[in-house]
From Swiss-Prot:
It is an enzyme of class 7 (translocase). It holds the Pfam family ABC_tran. Part of the ABC transporter complex TagGH involved in teichoic acids export. Responsible for energy coupling to the transport system. Belongs to the ABC transporter superfamily. Teichoic acids exporter (TC 3.A.1.104.1) family. CDD domains: ABC_KpsT_Wzt (cd03220). ATP binds at G60, I61, N62, G63, S64, G65, K66, S67. It is a peripheral membrane protein. Keywords: ATP-binding, Cell membrane, Membrane, Nucleotide-binding, Translocase, Transport. It comes from Listeria innocua serovar 6a (strain ATCC BAA-680 / CLIP 11262). The lineage of its organism: Bacteria, Bacillati, Bacillota, Bacilli, Bacillales. This is Teichoic acids export ATP-binding protein TagH. GO terms for cellular component: plasma membrane. PANTHER family: TEICHOIC ACIDS EXPORT ATP-BINDING PROTEIN TAGH.
Length: 335
């Protein structure tokens, strides 16, 4: 193509452990790898390059791995296997990603820009433009936990496009909101394209992807099914969707079940992750992290109920303590 590679996925796979209950998540931290629970491969051996200035669409049915790819691209989660190379600063636009519910819209803008390394003077200059673009009125001074999904998307999009990223990853952010805001977003995307920015566009809307993208990657149950020119791949995907929708419900359920069972099967070939050690937790790290989470939740319970620590423990059975100690898989069960 003659352009520099901006994003490279090399044999990338992402594995999640499947647990029967919440307490098993903590137990899994201390189990040997050979005794781990059943796994689910959200991505399996995915490889592609995205070049400087390209706009590439990611399409596929629910659970195909689109959002997993966008999260790995943006550094939200690491891959389990394979290598990811990102040449530039990435900004992920998805509904409520990185926004803090208790903070107001105004406070979230300031926090996000501070995290991008901006000085207070720079933030003050950008603030009016971001608020105007988001166009959420007086809600800018309200906690975003009270926002609708459309309002959160507006604010997230407005912040991200004003950070001037090299790579813009848009994950279903245009699926909410009215037509006026959608057109405003499309104009901004086209402006970014004219400036030679690299854009990854994740959407269920085939019309949006065809109109905005140069190439399309069609994900299907964690694997790449087709990749190529936008019109060609979009036509094949459209034909598949029409065919699938015509099938009886029993066949649809069987089809999806078979593919999900395939995603639970062990990876046949292992590709090393060069950065794996950066994400691996030692046994001591796991112990400290688990203890911190349990104590934090217990303390929060004490504050909420007004009980003493001794009184709480006397009323809490071992099973209840295990129920309290809930850890999210994405955050600490990474291998």
């Amino acid at each position: 193509m003659g352009k520099n590679i901006k994003i490279a996925f090399k044999h990338v796979s992402k594995e999640y452990d499947l647990y029967q209950n919440k307490s098993d998540k903590i137990k899994g931290l201390f189990m040997p790898k050979s005794q781990k629970m059943q796994s689910f491969w959200a991505l399996r051996d995915v490889s592609f390059d995205i070049h400087d200035g390209e706009t590439v669409g990611l399409i596929g049915i629910n659970g195909s791995g689109k959002s997993t790819i966008s999260s790995i691209m943006s550094g939200v989660i690491p891959p389990t296997q394979g290598e990811v190379v990102i040449n530039g600063e990435t900004s992920l636009i998805a509904i409520a990603v990185g926004l803090k519910g208790p903070l107001t819209g105004y406070e979230n803008i300031r926090l996000k820009l501070l995290m991008h390394g901006m000085k207070s003077s720079q933030i003050n200059k950008l603030m009016p433009s971001i608020i105007e673009f988001a166009d959420i009125g007086d809600f800018i001074n309200q906690p975003i936990k009270n926002y609708s999904s459309g309002m959160r998307s507006r604010l997230g999009f407005a912040i991200s496009v004003h950070t001037n990223p090299d790579i813009l990853v848009i994950d279903e952010a245009l699926s909410v909101g009215d037509q006026t805001f959608y057109e405003k977003c499309v104009n901004k995307i086209n402006e970014f394209k004219a400036r030679g920015k690299t854009i990854v566009f994740v959407s269920h809307s085939l019309g949006q992807v065809k109109s905005l993208c140069d190439r399309i990657i069609w994900m299907h149950h964690g694997e790449i099914r087709e990749m190529g020119e936008a019109k060609e791949v979009a036509q094949k995907y459209d034909e598949f969707v029409k065919w699938f929708n015509k099938q009886p419900n029993d066949y649809k359920k069987k089809y999806q079940k078979e593919h999900k069972e395939h995603q639970k099967a062990p990876q046949k070939k292992v590709y090393p992750n060069p950065n794996a050690n950066k994400y691996r937790l030692t046994l001591f790290d796991k112990f400290l992290l688990t203890a911190l989470i349990v104590l934090t939740i217990l303390f929060g319970t004490l504050v909420a109920t007004g009980k003493s620590f001794k009184g709480l423990i006397s009323e809490t059975s071992t099973n209840q303590v295990e129920q309290i100690a809930y850890v999210d898989n994405n955050e600490i069960t990474i291998r």
